[in-house]
């Protein structure tokens, strides 16, 4: 079975941008036919990687952005080894920016230099832009169980890109 995913093509400031949103979790299993769902299992992830490789080759875009509603534990700042491996595979298949979220709190982010010298970005989780999850926060104690108190924090990014032959900086 070949999966198909919907995506947007955006033309902005001389860039051709592919924006592809996916989710790895479903609140209702019967809704997967209406959204870009990638089950967090090896077979489905490999199919998705092949889809992305083919899409990048077909569209010849300057920038490929993937938005991931990640199969990730909420309220934890840890980036798992499996998550790191998965995101590196996605960068290797041609994605330039991974914009992941699910934890509801801020996680780390990093810039990766690929084999051609291009800079790629992974944002593991940017918190909540708007949140109603925080009630009676307690910031005075160092307690892992209180990470939910950090759900009121969120990041917005300004990323400046420059086109060079064969890469984006």
Predicted regions and their residues:
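Active-site environment of divalent metal-dependent phosphoester hydrolases
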Residues: 1-7, 26-29, 71-76, 98-112, ...
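Glycine-rich, Lys/Arg-enriched anion-binding loops that position phosphate/diphosphate groups
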Residues: 87-88, 95-134, 148
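Divalent metal-coordination and catalytic microenvironments
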Residues: 20, 65, 102, 124, ...
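Binuclear metal-dependent hydrolase catalytic cores centered on His/Asp/Glu-rich metal-binding motifs
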Residues: 12-64, 83-85
């Amino acid at each position: 079975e070949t999966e198909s995913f919907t995506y947007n093509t955006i033309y902005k400031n001389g860039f051709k941008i592919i924006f592809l949103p996916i989710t790895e979790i479903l609140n209702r299993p019967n809704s997967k036919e209406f959204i870009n769902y990638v089950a967090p299992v090896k077979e489905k992830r490999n199919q998705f990687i092949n889809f992305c490789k083919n899409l990048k080759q077909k569209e010849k875009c300057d920038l490929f952005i993937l938005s991931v509603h990640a199969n990730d534990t909420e309220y934890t700042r840890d980036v798992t080894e499996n998550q790191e491996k998965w995101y590196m595979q996605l960068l290797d298949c041609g994605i330039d920016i991974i914009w992941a979220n699910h934890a509801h709190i801020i996680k780390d982010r990093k810039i990766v230099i690929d084999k051609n010298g291009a800079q790629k970005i992974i944002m593991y989780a940017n918190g909540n832009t708007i949140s109603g999850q925080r009630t009676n926060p307690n910031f005075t104690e160092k307690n892992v169980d209180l990470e939910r108190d950090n759900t009121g924090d969120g990041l917005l990014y300004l990323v400046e890109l420059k086109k060079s032959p064969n890469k984006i900086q």
